[in-house]
């Protein structure tokens, strides 16, 4: 089964998405937390063997430098370039935000004019579909990447050899549906809690995406950074 995850337009687009969740001025966000979320996203893409553009890795290396300097004990006065790196990054995110807002406004105006002359093109793209509570598949994917970052140590020390085909999406879909029959609702954290292997967690996640795609399961996240809740959809 081929499940695509909506690509961001670039690393700044991903960073803007993460920063916007805090709903504060870009210069007030907890930059280390944002960096950790970005790195967790990149690591999850790599673990899932999804294609990753080089610009994302370049940004990751720059973010790791900023994070390491932030976390190192301040034994000496802060070097000027340390502050410059962080401020330069935040400035780029702010500038990108302005350009993106402008491009969206221009696109909106273009669409309005197009309505005067022809019927708009109808598209239904699963990767960009809005789910319950205005959440998207990307919100689910970002939540998954955070959970995987938290479980990395457990996966690292589990040396049991698991064949690639030992976990099947179809089987995991049945497992999720069976649990929802019993429990009515299930958090993403609970769903992945007992996974001992990375492949198992990834297969469970892909199974949940397929159930959402088929509208058999809905998701809800009532607040930014809150728990992702899966519920059986009433047919």
UniProtKB/Swiss-Prot annotation:
Disulfide bond annotation, renumbered to this chain: none
Keyword Chaperone in record: no
Keyword terms: Cell cycle, Cell division, Chromosome partition, Cytoplasm
Cell compartment(s), UniProt: Cytoplasm
Example GO biological process: chromosome segregation
Domain of life: Bacteria
Gene Ontology cellular-component terms listed: cytoplasm
InterPro entries according to UniProt: ScpA, ScpA-like_C
Signal peptide: none
Function of the protein: Participates in chromosomal partition during cell division. May act via the formation of a condensin-like complex containing Smc and ScpB that pull DNA away from mid-cell into both cell halves.
Quaternary assembly: Component of a cohesin-like complex composed of ScpA, ScpB and the Smc homodimer, in which ScpA and ScpB bind to the head domain of Smc. The presence of the three proteins is required for the association of the complex with DNA.
HAMAP family reported for this sequence: ScpA
Family: Belongs to the ScpA family.
Name of the protein described by the UniProt record: Segregation and condensation protein A
